[in-house]
């Protein structure tokens, strides 16, 4: 069966939701209360712990397999950015680093070149920047454009490029 990484991630999310639902079923039915004058079998919920537990295990195995195939896809599929080829797994690390740098440098974009501080008696103090304002603005714009380019290319690959998974994972 062929899937895109977007579909594989949706399948993983769906399986995890099913696990969460089955966990809830176990919590609600693993123990039950019965009045002293009530027949226990009449009060016992219709529930098979072992079957439910095995369903969870089966779904967990599917998630492990899907994530493995997704990771293999991410380590083998390359995307070109600025004339350099990156595998998706490297690109995900790279875009996280770029976002950190974008946040850091963004905090200096609006920093005034010179700022008057509070008066201490007769002396007036100023705080001055110790960097090139033009560099900061240009670098912020460059990083922003690069992150956007990467995200668009990742989205395109995630939604269009298919890879093979075993049929039993669907």
Regions found by a protein language model. Give the residues of each.
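Structural preference for solvent-exposed beta-strand-turn elements
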Residues: 1-170
């Amino acid at each position: 069966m062929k899937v895109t990484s977007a579909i594989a991630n949706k399948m993983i999310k769906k399986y995890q939701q099913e696990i969460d639902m089955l966990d809830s079923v176990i919590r609600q039915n693993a123990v039950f209360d019965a009045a002293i004058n009530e027949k226990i079998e009449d009060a016992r919920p219709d529930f098979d712990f072992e079957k439910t537990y095995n369903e969870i295990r089966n779904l967990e195995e599917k998630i492990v397999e899907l994530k493995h195939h997704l990771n293999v896809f991410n380590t083998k599929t390359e995307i070109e950015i600025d004339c350099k080829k990156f595998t998706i797994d490297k690109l995900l690390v790279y875009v996280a680093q770029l976002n950190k740098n974008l946040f850091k440098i963004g905090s200096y974009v609006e920093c005034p070149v010179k700022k008057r501080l509070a008066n201490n008696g007769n002396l007036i103090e100023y705080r001055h920047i110790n960097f090139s304002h033009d560099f900061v603005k240009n670098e912020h714009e460059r990083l922003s454009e690069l992150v956007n380019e990467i995200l668009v290319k990742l989205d395109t690959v995630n939604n269009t490029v298919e890879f093979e998974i075993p049929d039993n994972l669907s």
